[in-house]
Amino acid sequence: MSKKLSVQEIILTLQKFWSDQGCMLMQSYDTEKGAGTMSPYTFLRAIGPEPWNAAYVEPSRRPADGRYGENPNRLYQHHQFQVVMKPSPENVQDLYLQSLEKLGINPLEHDIRFVEDNWENPSMGCAGVGWEVWLDGMEISQFTYFQQVGGLEVDPVTSEITYGLERLSSYIQDVNSVFDLEWGDGVKYGDIFLEPEFENSKYAFEDSNEELLLMLFDEYEKEAKRQIKNGLVHPAYDYCLKCSHTFNLMDARGMVSVTERAGYLDRIRNMAKSIAKEFVAQREKRGFPLLKHAQEETK
C-alpha cells in the first residue's frame, strides 16, 4: 500500500463503497451502547419483513475493557463501521472483499480467513451464524447472518458486517498503538481520545457512584416498561440501552456477583424482547411501509 489512509479516509472510503451498494448512510445513534448491533438502525430494523440496507459508524462503549489509555489495543470506547443488509445479498461476502480492495488490501496478496465464530448477545435476545475475519493474523471484522433478534426469528435473512475501525486502521497504517493512528489532517488518535480514555476508565473502575448506578438501573427499567405499555417503542428502547450501559458500568465496578449478573441480563433481555415485539406489531399495523415501497419499485 503506497498511501496510508487516515482513519477519516478509511471511513469515507467505506461510506462511499457501501452507499454505492444501496446502503443508506446513517449517523451514529446518540445513546451509549456496547456494540453497533445495538443501534436501533440494526436491532429494530433487522426484525420484521421490511427491507433495510444501512451503513454507519458507531462509537461503542465497553467500560470493563478500559485500560486508562495505557494499553495500545484495549479501549473503554472503540469505533465500529456497521453494515446491515436485509435481505442479505447472495454475494455479500464478495462485496466485503471488494470493500477491502477499495482500502488498498488485495485479497490475492494477503491471508484473509473467515474463522467460524457464531455470535450471540444474550442480554438482547440475539443470535446468529457468524465468522471472524482475520487479515494476516489480525481480526478486523465480524460477519454475521442474524437468526434471532430481540427473541424474534429474523426473516428474511439479514447480514451484518462489523469492521473494527481501530484494528483495521492499525493494520493499514502499520502502527502498534491505536493512539499513534492518524485520524485526519495530521491529528493523532491519541490527541482526540487519550484523555477521555483515561478519564472514563478512572470513572468506571474507581469513581462511579455505586448507589446511583443501582438506582439508575431500576429507574431506567421502570421507564422502559412504562413506555412499552404506552406503545412508545423508541423512548422505551433508549431506556433499555441506558439499562445496558448502566449494567456495564456496574460490572466494571465489580458490583455484580455471578448470580446477580444472570438476573440483570434477564431483565435487560425481557425489555428488549417486549420492545422488539411491539415494534413489529406497530409496523404491521402500518402495513409494513418499507415493504410496500420496495414492491412498488420492482413493478
UniProtKB/Swiss-Prot annotation:
| Keyword annotations from UniProtKB, A to Z | Aminoacyl-tRNA synthetase, ATP-binding, Cytoplasm, Ligase, Nucleotide-binding, Protein biosynthesis
Q: Where in the cell is it found?
A: Cytoplasm
> Which Pfam families does this UniProt record tie to the protein?
tRNA-synt_2e (PF02091)
CC terms in the record's Gene Ontology section: cytosol
Give the NCBIfam families listed for this entry: glyQ, PRK09348.1
Quaternary structure and interacting proteins, as annotated: Tetramer of two alpha and two beta subunits.
Q: What is this protein called?
A: Glycine--tRNA ligase alpha subunit
